[in-house]
Amino acid sequence: MTPSMTDSAVKAAMAVIASSPATTQEKIEMLIEMAQGFQKKPKTAQDLWNAVSLCHQAHELCAEDNLLWKARAKAGMATALKAIPDVGEQLLLEAKQRLEEALPILQRTLASTEGTSAQQYPQQFASAEEVAEAQMNLGLVLQSLVPFNLARMTDSIQAYQKALQVFTWQKYPQEYAILHNNIAIAYLSMPLTSEKESLRQGLAVQTFEEALKHIRLINHPREYAMLQNNLGNALQYLPSSHPLENILQAIAAYDEALKVRDPKDTPLEYANTISNKANALFSLPDNPEKPEAGNLKNMQQARAYYQEAWEIFTQHGQIEQAEVVVHMLQEVETEIGKS
């Protein structure tokens, strides 16, 4: 693919680099560094297309024997392609191809670094972190391709697990948390027979709980809230002989997430969590020891949460989520009317 969606400012910067007296290797490094700048905090999809173009230009400048930097350019293109909003299957397939071409080269150059620091010689050697990041991105791409029936979830999980060999909780807690979150969601998404349903959901719960042994609220609040919210979802729908206990644990997990998520600083995440908590409250008896007494109080609290979530989703243009919440709001109104 030759990128065509490059804005004029980036084209001008590419032209300046091309005409500069820098060496070809220096130009390649400048282009990839610029691309990484666009990828780190993209404001629009255009920033990601710019990153694709810059990596493509870097790849074109690489000589045939400059395999490591060709691989880095390919990995950079893939990272940008997978992050483009509403990305379709064709761009995901291209990202997959780029990563599958880059990974063997990164792994080979990593294998030759025994006794040598990749940080000392970045032009010659890949780092373990580079390889792990490529594995993590491959896992994300494969997971995104599963709904198109173009990849297997087991391959996605395998890629994540390879990345975890480097991204340990001691050194890379944020990546560790994200990888565990993605693995757990992958388990929840696997199409298994009904008798294996509880197994995959149980694996997801275990994966979230394992990550939360190391990801603490005080040190990594954002990742902590993400894991607690998704643990709540897994617990809420976990097939069990004691569903009431699971719902109570799910609500406790949502409450942990809400220690971080609030309507001012993280409105969409907050709305997501309170709507999840409302789902749990909807079916929770007011007095778990006397379920026959009903759950009017909890349904009223659920209604308040749904209403607040709907207002936030609508305000931020999240139409699909708003429609889901409206449907649940109508259901709870109907049930309250019967009480």
Model-identified regions with their sequence ranges:
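Eukaryotic tandem repeat interaction scaffolds
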Residues: 174-286, 304
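Flexible helix-coil transition and linker loops at the boundaries of alpha-helical arrays
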Residues: 16-25, 58-70, 102-131, 164-176, ...
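Flexible inter-repeat linkers and adjacent short helices
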Residues: 1-93, 99, 105-114, 121-129, ...
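Conserved alpha-helical positions within TPR/SEL1-like repeat arrays
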Residues: 29-43, 69-85, 126-146, 174-189, ...
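TPR/TPR-like (Sel1-like) alpha-helical repeat modules
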Residues: 252-255, 294-317, 330
